[in-house]
Structure formats: C-alpha cells, structure tokens
Curated annotation (Swiss-Prot):
One of its GO terms (molecular function) is tyrosine-based site-specific recombinase activity. InterPro entries: CB (IPR044068), DNA_brk_join_enz (IPR011010), Integrase-like_cat_sf (IPR013762), Integrase_catalytic (IPR002104), Integrase_recombinase_N (IPR010998), Integrase_SAM-like_N (IPR004107), Recomb_XerC (IPR011931), Tyrosine_recombinase_XerC/XerD (IPR023009). It is found in: Cytoplasm. Residues 2-88 form the Core-binding (CB) domain. This is Tyrosine recombinase XerC. Its main location: cytoplasm. Signal peptide: none annotated. Residues 109-288 form the Tyr recombinase domain. NCBIfam families: PRK00283.1, recomb_XerC.
Amino acid sequence: MTDLHTDVERYLRYLSVERQLSPITLLNYQRQLEAIINFASENGLQSWQQCDAAMVRNFAVRSRRKGLGAASLALRLSALRSFFDWLVSQNELKANPAKGVSAPKAPRHLPKNIDVDDMNRLLDIDINDPLAVRDRAMLEVMYGAGLRLSELVGLDIKHLDLESGEVWVMGKGSKERRLPIGRNAVAWIEHWLDLRDLFGSEDDALFLSKLGKRISARNVQKRFAEWGIKQGLNNHVHPHKLRHSFATHMLESSGDLRGVQELLGHANLSTTQIYTHLDFQHLASVYDAAHPRAKRGK
C-alpha cells in the first residue's frame, strides 16, 4: 500500500469514527478519493506533498473529458478539498492544493416527485405476507416524515415514540431530528411490530430483512422499485423520490419553507429552496388550466 492509499485509509477512519458518517456517505468518499489516487499514481506521485493546484486542475479536466457530469465533478472536488483540509490539519500538507479549483456550474435539475394520486396508489399495496407489511410501513414512514434512505435503514425500535407519533433520526453531520410521522405510519409500524418477531432476530433495527438482519439500503431500493411496477406507476420509484414528494406536497399545502427545511434536516435554506421551483410549477399548471386569460397569444 502506497502513502497515497495509507493517508486515504486514515482519513476514511477519521470520517467513520470521529465524524460518524453513514456507510453510504463513506462509500461515496472512498470512490471519489480512489479516482484521485489512480490519477496521482499514473502521474508518478508517491505522496500527497507532491500534489499541486495544476495537478488538481488536470484531474478535473480529465474527469470531464471522461464524461463526468458537472454535478458529479463538483462532488468529487468537494471530497478532495475536504481530504486535503484534513491533511493540513494533520500537518501533512502546508496548504490545500484544491482550494482554488472549482467545477463548472452544474445545471439546476428539479427533483422528480410522485403526485398525490400516484402516491396513494403506491401506498395501497396488497398486504399478503409479513414482508409486504414491512414494506408498507417503510413506505409510510419515508413519505410520512421525508426521511433520507440512510435515516430509514438506521432506525432502531428505541427511536420510536408511537404514543406521540414521532421518531428520532440521526441525519447528516450526526444531527438528530425529532419528527412527526402521522397516524397512518404509526398504524403500519404497529402492524409490522406485531409480525417482526417472526424473523427471530435480536437486532435492534426497526426494519429487518427476511434473514433477520437490519435491512440494507440496496434492499429498500429494490423493494420500492418492485412495488412501483406492481402498483402501475409510470415512473421509477426510488426512496429519494418519496423524500422529494414529501417536501413538495408539504410546501404546496403549507407554503412554510422554514418548516420544511427543519423537517428535511437541511443545514441551509438554499437546499430547500429548490422546492419553491416545484411549487411554482404546480401553481403555473393550475393557472394554465383554470384562468380564462391563460392561453396567451390566441
């Protein structure tokens, strides 16, 4: 293992132990940093002390030429800047060579969501076995509270307060949130808890796989996609789309951007503001359908 790999391994341990980042986030960091390790090795670097701003810029250019999108490149450079900042804090580097290197601005894509009618159809699944009950409970909780996938699979039974209809989740940056989940979600969690012991696990996890272990993020993605097809939804159903749908429907109903920010666990309001564009799309479609002067130019 080279010094390049050794430093990255140390950094990943720091993120896991000190920062307590989720396994999914750690895997993303690892993938981004493996790309720069490969590039640095190809260019003859033996240690990060040999890396300079020119090399980081060349790395960014090469990544773009290989088809990496602007948003993905921004993520890669962000991971690299964080890594170099850590090396500076460890007195391994004097300065961060990635500090002044920026990715081209990514086009702003509005997140896709599921409309209310389709969401009701998705949730109205045929409950014919314990795993279907579990899936219904997961769908209700994710849509009812707008959870991230990592927050859903990380739920333990001790995080529930069913009497008050709330859950505690650990979000990004180890920030805890206490969230309402609604009556339907509470009812389906209770239904699932009645069946959960059939899997014979002593695991603390709320949602279990058929093997009695904490359900994996990949398994949740697979099951949600399968239910989307079974329920006849035209668009691919994935967990983050339920989070987008929660945010969109909450904003359409309440108009309370700050409240939605708190529920989603966004550190910055600007992250939540993208949903105001979705809300405007909804209002514009209502206007075009209903207002007598909407059909302009005719």
